Regions:
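Bacterial N-terminal signal peptides that target proteins for export
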Residues: 1-6
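C-terminal motif of bacterial Sec signal peptides marking the signal peptidase cleavage site
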Residues: 14-16
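C-terminal functional module detector
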Residues: 18-78, 82-85, 89-141, 167-170, ...
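Low-complexity, serine/threonine/proline-enriched polar segments
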Residues: 135-162, 549
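Long, charge-dense tracts
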Residues: 216-218
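Conserved, charged catalytic cores of large soluble enzymes
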Residues: 221, 231-233
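Active-site gating/metal-coordination segments in enzymes
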Residues: 221-226, 294
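Acidic, metal/ion-coordinating pockets
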Residues: 229, 237
Length: 549
């Protein structure tokens, strides 16, 4: 099953906070520069001007992440994660081996949480600099309950949006772990064969609203340390920091994810403090966040039945927190008017398709569209691995869902942990697809920025979409169809400008995963604004099984 969303327009955002704090703990825009002799040379690599499809995962956690180490028992490292992506077997926290069933991935980013980056691993080290901290005993304990207490104590520090006091907020520990992360990413980068990205996750969750972003850097260099929620809970401050790095020569993108649990805050029609969106604000957001992760283990963030009632697949892999309340027999609870009683979070501002329309509405008001973004999928796997293969699913969070019993796949008499209600509903998903000239950091990063990208829930389906005014009727049958599509139009992610009353033509190409099932249909979801109100309509453009679009 494949669907495409065509909205020909643009938009974006800004803000900041001042804090009186120790200068050593302030966010820094200093950049770590590599020795030029160790940098990668791509001049000898072949390029395909018509671009190749590459698949990867830009959202993976290793033992540097607070929750992976203390809550899930994950000991697999950043280096192990890259080994997994290349097709090697690594250890699951439950002791068995995990590896990809299908082909190796083309690109990968280990994006550990900025908050307490490497700190828990240091607490667990009997010879480490934090070995005498009171929480070290909880983290080092063989009792999982103690580990969880340590996790809860650390996580509680992150809701304040304030610098963490030493020694837990040790800049030395953070910078050392971050520098190691950069070194390992660069060591595993093999231009033309396997691309790694320096990355981390900004993990702001004010009042339990998910405002997380993966931050991705394009080259061999990275900042001195990552900017996290301990620096600010406000993502607008993150954009300011990224802009400052950009002015010093270090580009980046931030990728929002799990907007489905943002309580409607991810894609608001106002600023974070409730102010009006201005053109400058909109441009800043678009500059820093040109793409969005719309599918992963914790469900889809594409759309919701309440937002797309005419879409029969709008409930695809919804997280249970977004599906609506159910009774003891699993039936949706409805109010006296017959409406589904929703959980918090299933709201306007929480889904990407709704945001595309909101951006068009904002453009009419302020002249700029801050939600003209592209889509990717990734996993958010916390085992230093990517569980996107449905028939080889090994869970997301180590010892919390690493067995069939813990995922509810087989019956058990054992008492299940409180997180069990979450693990029941997690999905094997997803992947990022890009169209790029070559498998290098530069080429893939540019594909991400121009949004010639797509999301899948795991299968390696190859999707292309073009728009233009001069496409011949037989373009789909032409042997040089892709070349003509580029020459006479614009690819997915681009802008097709209106030309009077001329009617555009669209060219869609999709091919199945060679190891997966056949495609059932291709759809285009059209969104538009009429008299200040947004609308969407779904079109079947190609069907199998003798169905007629």
């Amino acid at each position: 099953f494949l669907r495409l969303y065509w909205i020909p327009i643009i938009c974006l955002g800004l803000l900041a906070c001042n804090r009186d704090q120790d200068a050593s703990l302030e966010p820094t825009t200093e950049i770590i520069k590599l020795n030029p002799d160790t940098m990668h040379d791509h001049r000898i690599l072949e390029q395909n001007a018509l671009r190749n499809a590459y698949f990867g995962d830009l959202h993976v956690h290793s033992n540097n992440s607070l929750d992976a180490y203390s809550l899930a028992g994950v000991r697999a490292s950043t280096d192990d994660a890259y080994r997994f992506a290349r097709g090697e077997a690594i250890d699951h926290p439950f002791g068995y081996k995990i590896r990809l069933k299908g082909e190796a991935l083309d690109f990968y980013a280990v994006s550990d949480h900025a908050e307490f980056f490497g700190v828990v691993k240091s607490l667990a080290d009997p010879a480490g600099p934090l070995r005498d901290h009171p929480l070290a005993a909880l983290i080092q304990s063989p009792d999982k309950a103690d580990n969880r207490k340590g996790f809860v104590a650390l996580e509680s520090e992150l809701t304040r949006g304030e610098p963490i006091d030493p020694p837990l907020g040790s800049e030395a520990v953070l910078r050392s772990a971050w520098q190691e992360n950069i070194n390992i990413a660069n060591k595993n980068y093999e231009p033309g064969k396997f691309t790694t990205f320096i990355a981390y996750e900004y993990s702001s969750h004010p009042q339990n609203a998910n405002l997380h972003r993966v931050v991705l850097f394009p080259g061999d260099d990275g900042p001195l340390r990552p900017f996290g929620s301990q620096d600010s809970l406000n993502p607008e401050d993150l954009w300011d920091w990224l802009d400052a790095l950009r002015s010093d020569g270090l580009d980046s993108i931030a990728i929002p994810h799990n907007s489905n649990w943002s309580q409607g805050l991810m894609f608001q029609r106002v600023t974070m403090d409730g102010g009006p969106v201005t053109p400058a604000y909109a441009k800043q957001r678009l500059r820093n966040e040109p793409i969005v992760e719309i599918t992963q283990i914790k469900g889809t963030s594409e759309t919701h039945p309440l937002l797309s009632p005419e879409d029969e697949w709008s409930d695809f892999e919804l997280w249970f927190k977004n599906r609506g309340k159910v009774d003891e027999e699993g039936r949706r609870i409805r109010d006296e008017d017959g409406n589904v009683v929703e959980f918090d979070g299933a709201t306007t501002g929480a889904y990407a398709r709704d945001a595309l329309l909101a951006g068009m509405e904002l453009e009419e008001a302020v002249g700029t569209n801050m939600y003209q973004f592209g889509f990717i999928g990734s996993t958010d796997g916390h085992n230093a691995a990517s569980p996107f293969e449905e028939d080889e699913y090994f869970g997301k969070l180590g010892t919390n869902d690493g067995s069939p019993e813990l995922r509810g796949s087989v019956p058990t008499d054992e008492k299940l942990p409180s997180i069990f209600s979450d693990t029941l509903d997690w999905s094997a998903s997803g992947l990022a697809g890009v169209w790029a000239e070559q498998n290098t950091r530069e080429s893939i990063f540019q594909a991400l920025k121009r949004k010639e990208i797509f999301a899948t829930s795991g299968p390696r389906i190859r999707v292309r979409f073009f728009g233009g005014y001069d496409y011949p009727d037989d373009l789909d049958r032409a042997p040089d169809s892709i070349e003509k599509a580029y020459a006479k139009g614009v690819p997915m992610g681009g802008e097709l400008l209106a030309e009077g009353n001329r009617v555009p033509h669209f060219f869609l190409s999709a091919s199945r995963d060679p190891s997966g099932g056949f495609l059932q249909r291709a759809q285009i979801v059209k969104g538009w604004i009429n008299e200040g109100k947004s609308h969407e309509q779904i079109f079947d453009v190609a069907c199998s099984d003798n169905l007629v679009p």
